[in-house]
Design a protein with these regions (language model features):
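Feature recognizes metal-dependent phosphohydrolase scaffolds
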Residues: 1-212
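N-terminal low-complexity segments that are often proline-rich with Ser/Thr-Pro
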Residues: 216-217
Length: 217
């Protein structure tokens, strides 16, 4: 991000160093060259953990606001016993590999800390004010799409929801259900509406579109 778009990640680095100073963050290892500077690798792991925890919190807030997304299984921070260092999933208790969560309030695990809130405000401003990044995003929306028929081939983003028999599975969005091409059309409609109109509901649908692709809906 810094080399390609000139986006300042120093605020994230500073936050990570201060918050996880004595945490090796081994569970958040990132791909690195064999000859990489160990100090840089260590910093990258701290930054990875810092932004990952923030991501889990913000995703949780959206899921709680939009129960129709049916993504409650992604709500994990409230399933953790922070004193024991365990998590309860589908009635079974598992020990966590990483037990250090200094920014999580066990009574309100999806709320950003003041420092996290300030960090995200700065990062959002940096991303929104990056002319080069915004130019590339506009290009993607102007020229791209969720699917394309090209050279007798169907190219599509993410994955197509299917049922056990291999037929298109219906997915509920709003008050209606969609499947196959119709599903992709409505997701693209909301993605474009969210980008061009900057409406909060469609903005959250952009996150849903991304998560849905990851989950296979």
């Amino acid at each position: 991000m810094e080399d390609g778009y000139g986006i300042n990640l120093v605020p994230l680095a500073s936050f990570a160093i201060e918050t996880y100073a004595n945490d090796p963050c081994q569970c958040f290892r990132v791909h690195a060259q064999e000859d990489s500077d160990l100090r840089e690798v260590s910093l990258n792991m701290k930054m990875h953990k810092a932004i990952a925890i923030i991501q889990f919190k913000l995703e949780g807030q959206v899921i709680k606001r939009r129960p129709e997304f049916n993504m409650d299984k992604r709500l994990l921070l409230d399933k953790i016993d922070y004193e024991e260092g365990t998590i309860m999933i589908e009635g079974k208790k598992y020990e966590l590999l990483d037990k250090s969560f200094p920014t999580i309030d066990p009574n309100n695990p999806y709320e950003l800390s003041e420092a996290e809130e300030a960090l995200m405000n700065r990062l959002c401003m940096n991303f929104l004010n990056c002319d080069k990044l915004q130019e590339h995003i506009r290009f993607l929306f102007n020229k791209g799409g969720l699917y394309l028929c090209y050279n007798s081939n169907l190219l599509y983003h993410g994955c197509v929801p299917l049922d056990e028999k291999g037929n298109f599975r219906k997915v509920k969005i709003g008050s209606k259900q969609y499947s196959g091409k119709e599903l992709y059309d409505v997701l693209e409609y909301y993605a474009r509406k969210g980008y061009y109109e900057q409406d909060n509901r469609e903005e959250h649908c952009l996150l849903y579109t991304s998560d849905a692709a990851d989950e296979g809906l």
